[in-house]
Amino acid sequence: MVVVGVLALQGDWIEHIELLREIEGVEAVPVKTEKQLESIDALIIPGGESTTIGRLIERRGLLEPLRDRIRAGLPVLGTCAGSILLAKKVRDRVVGPVEQPLLAVMDIAVLRNAFGRQMNSFEAEVHIEGVGTVHAAFIRAPIIEETWGEARPIAKLNHPLLGEVTVAARQKAIIATVFHPEITGDSKLHKLLVAAAKGRAF
């Protein structure tokens, strides 16, 4: 049995739990404490409000424990706000540079709210390297502006206003997506995370 934790401080963590429970051989658990973090084989950082999630991570004393486990090789999937929290550099489309707590474990720069407001949300088919085509929901989504070091793009999207943009990246056992696969019920990335937790090629 593979234990996959979902950071459950704010955001749409319940949708991830429900999707994980449909995968055979997986126990899906909410993670709110350092003790719960210690017992998992993989982690999902869900969408939500990245500044709020970051502050709650700090308040609960989870910032360093999360960084330590991820740097030690814990497989991680960060979706939407999760990709922002994983990034080493973050700015906002409207206000520019922002000050917010970050895990800062991934060599990516993220632009918050890149597609505009909630009314500009949309769904699209996205081809992800090594995964296949995922039906993705973009809700006040960021984009990955830059990758360097050990991170590399694994999915791009042609947008009518922004042109070609990076919407997913990978660094070792970490995957960041700017979209929500859980909202559309697409479990391909979740199954990839489970495979990584089992020690299969990632």
Swiss-Prot record:
Recorded GO CC terms: cytosol; glutaminase complex
Single GO molecular function: glutaminase activity
One Pfam family of this chain: SNO
ATP-binding listed as a keyword: no
Enzyme Commission number: 4.3.3.6, 3.5.1.2
Binding residue positions for L-glutamine: G48, E49, S50, R112, I139, R140
Active site: C80, H180, E182
Stated family: Belongs to the glutaminase PdxT/SNO family.
Its job: Catalyzes the hydrolysis of glutamine to glutamate and ammonia as part of the biosynthesis of pyridoxal 5'-phosphate. The resulting ammonia molecule is channeled to the active site of PdxS.
Descriptive protein name: Pyridoxal 5'-phosphate synthase subunit PdxT
The organism of origin for this protein: Hyperthermus butylicus (strain DSM 5456 / JCM 9403 / PLM1-5)
Gene: pdxT
